[in-house]
UniProtKB/Swiss-Prot annotation:
It comes from the Bacteria. It holds the Pfam family MerR_1. Residues 6-25 bind DNA. Keywords: DNA-binding, Repressor, Transcription, Transcription regulation. Repressor of the yfmOP operon. A mutation in yfmP leads to overexpression of yfmO, probably causing a decrease in cellular copper that is eventually responsible for a reduced copper induction of copZA. Induction: YfmP is autoregulated. There is no induction with copper or other metals. GO terms for biological process: negative regulation of DNA-templated transcription. Residues 1-73 form the HTH merR-type domain. The keyword Zinc does not apply. Coiled coil: none annotated. Gene3D superfamilies: 1.10.1660.10. The lineage of its organism: Bacteria, Bacillati, Bacillota, Bacilli, Bacillales. This is HTH-type transcriptional regulator YfmP. One of its GO terms (molecular function) is DNA binding.
Length: 140
């Protein structure tokens, strides 16, 4: 397995080293392996997890708190999926599927709330644009 130091991860992700350390500190990404000297070593899996955080933040426009919550539910979803795949008991598999469904509903609720916020902001901007257009017309 090939390991990357934080400089390489920062360059590849487009984030600063400080941001990567902060994401680790607040639990957005798992703590990487460390050398005996304390140097962080990141695997390709760590990089993929960081890329998930970045894309979720960029696409959904979540605050750090919302992002933490969303990523935690994503991790819970993965655990439930693993539990479902490992179980042979139909009752247990059904319970895992219900937990997966509940987690997905929660994530969809978070996204719906963000969409409502964007829609409200868009409506305010459209109102301001309309006022500006009317003001221009009244001057002409």
């Amino acid at each position: 397995m090939e390991w990357m130091k934080i400089d390489q991860v920062a360059k590849r992700s487009g984030l600063t080293k400080r941001t990567i350390r902060f994401y680790e500190e607040i639990g957005l990404i798992p703590a990487p392996k460390r050398t005996d000297g304390g140097v962080r070593l990141y695997s390709e899996d760590d990089m993929e997890e960081l890329e998930k955080v970045i894309s979720t933040k960029e696409v959904l426009g979540f605050s750090l708190q919302e992002l933490q919550h969303f990523m935690e539910t994503s991790r819970q979803l993965e655990l439930n999926k693993e539990g479902y795949l490992l179980s042979l008991d139909p009752k247990e598999r059904k319970e895992k599927l219900e937990e997966i469904q509940e987690t997905l509903n929660h994530q969809l609720d978070l996204i719906d709330e963000k969409i409502r916020t964007f829609q409200s902001f868009k409506e305010r901007l459209q109102g301001m644009k309309g006022k500006a257009e009317r003001a221009i017309q009244s001057i002409e």
